[in-house]
């Protein structure tokens, strides 16, 4: 892992005009920031058996009237042997996030790999970094009032080795430390680097091109994680195709594991870019915008970890129904959110086709990813139709970006393909309606992404419904919806019936 130096132009973005639609945390809304440099936060014994003092830099929005702001502790990279809190992407990320409204504490920590270098000595270096990062979190809790920090919204981020530090701080419990690590020698994960008596709890992670030793350390109920990586990274894997000193499971694997455990997550992959995204300015800025949108939802979430099992009762009802019904291999599964669930006449409307009707919720695309094995895997299917993502674009602070809906859908498809390698999969376009007209541009963008993705994969299709549901003026048609101005009435489902029948007639 080499030192990377970024020109400051990365963060010198035009601040001259902001639309009313720009929002704190999601967008850059502060023209200037304040910086405080080299603030001591702790000390500990390094590998030379010397006492090493630790410092951090604080970035915060200038002239901010908010008294309690979310905090991001940022950990620089450098392979646990070099790097600095103020150079390269460390400064770029810290300044960019501060311009969005966060307080950012960029830290230095103990560096050095004990000889002889091995997977064990790299793991021990990571533990030392975790101990120091935890001390930094405790420092901000201890001094929250001085720095205007909201202690209920403390997040950790890092790049490369710093991301490895952040990930293991968040997900590696003391009892999970591998047996080959001598904790008597290295001390506990909490460490003694300073500010004892205060909590080191964090509420989310942003992983820039990092990896984990064991992805099974992420489990249901753990804090959310967002991941940024280049798919051509030859230093740290974005997948699991190789390892950096036993750090084998990169951003894509972490993203998929989080989805499987119901942990809020996201990923921004840059195709054909390497470690640190090859210093590519547009890619860095695009990734930071995606990070900002994800953090905006996280900051505004009432619960750090939403209840992924809120539709468990409905899923169990479907499972009971499945156990009592002998579906044939010609059955066609329709699953998704309330647009599917409320289609009460679906079996009659699509007769004589054999329909498995498994809508649930109000569900979102992450809940589809969590439940799709239980919804589909007990069947032999002729085709699969899915309507999901509508509730991720609901004019809410919890809305996903179109890219995150696409990436989550890709994971759903990956799961389905493990069981149904050749079965046709149809994604039904997200429909226009009055309740969500304010985000119609995002819905259109999402539909286009899903359509393009489906067109590149075998036996995958996109069911276009938009033109039939819009009026001559290009707007939603109120006469197609019930009083909630969202769901279809009989006329709306008549249009869907006509389109689905035409689509089903083409199934081979």
Model-derived features with residue positions:
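Short beta-strand element of the alpha/beta-hydrolase
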Residues: 67-78
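Alpha/beta-hydrolase active-site loop
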Residues: 122-145, 408
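N-terminal cap/lid segment of alpha/beta-hydrolase-fold proteins
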Residues: 21-67
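C-terminal catalytic histidine-bearing segment of alpha/beta-hydrolase fold enzymes
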Residues: 248, 255-304, 482-508
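Oxyanion-hole/transition-state-stabilizing segment in secreted/luminal serine hydrolases
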Residues: 340-354, 368-406, 426, 430-434
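Short amphipathic alpha-helix adjacent to the substrate-entry channel of hydrolases
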Residues: 86-106
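Primarily recognizes the serine-hydrolase "nucleophile elbow" in alpha/beta-hydrolase
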Residues: 135-221
């Amino acid at each position: 892992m080499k030192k990377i130096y970024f020109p400051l132009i990365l963060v010198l973005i035009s601040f001259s005009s902001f639309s009313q639609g720009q929002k704190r945390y999601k967008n850059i809304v502060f023209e200037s920031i304040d910086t405080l440099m080299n603030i001591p936060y702790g000390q500990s014994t390094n590998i030379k058996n010397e006492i090493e003092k630790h410092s951090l830099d604080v970035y915060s929005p200038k002239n901010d009237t908010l008294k309690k702001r979310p905090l991001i502790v940022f950990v620089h990279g450098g392979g646990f042997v070099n790097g600095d809190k103020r150079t390269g992407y460390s400064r770029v990320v810290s300044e960019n996030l501060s311009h969005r409204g966060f307080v950012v504490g960029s830290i230095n920590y103990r560096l050095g790999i004990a000889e002889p270098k091995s997977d064990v000595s790299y793991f021990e270096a990571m533990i030392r970094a975790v101990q120091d990062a935890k001390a930094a979190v405790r420092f901000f809790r201890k001094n929250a009032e001085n720095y205007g920090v909201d202690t209920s919204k403390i997040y950790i981020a890092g790049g490369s080795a710093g991301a490895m530090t952040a990930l293991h701080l968040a997900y590696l419990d003391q009892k999970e430390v591998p047996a080959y690590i001598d904790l008597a020698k290295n001390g506990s994960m909490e460490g003694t680097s300073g500010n004892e008596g205060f909590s080191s709890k964090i509420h989310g992670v942003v992983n820039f091109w990092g990896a984990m030793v064991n992805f099974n350390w992420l489990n249901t109920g753990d804090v959310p994680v967002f991941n940024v990586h280049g798919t051509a990274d030859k230093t740290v894997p974005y997948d699991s195709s190789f390892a950096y000193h036993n750090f084998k499971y990169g951003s894509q694997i972490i993203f998929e594991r989080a989805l499987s455990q119901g942990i809020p997550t996201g990923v921004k992959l840059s195709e054909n870019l390497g470690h640190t995204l090859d210093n590519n300015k547009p890619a860095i800025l695009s990734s930071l915008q995606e990070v900002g949108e994800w953090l905006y939802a996280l900051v505004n979430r009432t619960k750090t970890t939403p209840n992924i099992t809120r539709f468990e009762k409905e899923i169990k009802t479907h499972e009971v129904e499945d156990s009592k019904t002998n579906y044939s291999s010609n059955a066609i599964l329709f699953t998704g959110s309330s647009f599917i669930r409320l289609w009460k006449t679906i079996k009659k409307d699509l007769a004589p086709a054999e329909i498995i009707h498994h809508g649930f919720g109000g569900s979102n695309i992450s809940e589809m990813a969590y439940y799709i094995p239980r919804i589909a895997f007990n069947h032999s299917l002729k085709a699969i139709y899915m309507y999901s993502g509508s509730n991720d674009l609901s004019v809410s602070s919890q809305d996903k970006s179109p890219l995150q809906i696409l990436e989550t859908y890709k994971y759903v498809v990956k799961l389905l393909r493990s069981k149904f390698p050749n079965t046709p999969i149809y994604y039904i376009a997200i429909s226009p309606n009055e309740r969500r007209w304010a985000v119609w541009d995002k819905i259109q963008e999402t539909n286009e992404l899903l359509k393009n993705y489906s067109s590149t994969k075998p036996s995958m299709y996109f069911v276009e419904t938009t033109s039939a549901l819009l009026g001559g003026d290009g707007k939603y048609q109120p006469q197609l919806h019930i009083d909630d101005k969202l769901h279809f009435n009989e006329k709306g489902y008549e249009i869907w019936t006509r389109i689905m029948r035409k689509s089903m007639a083409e199934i081979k």
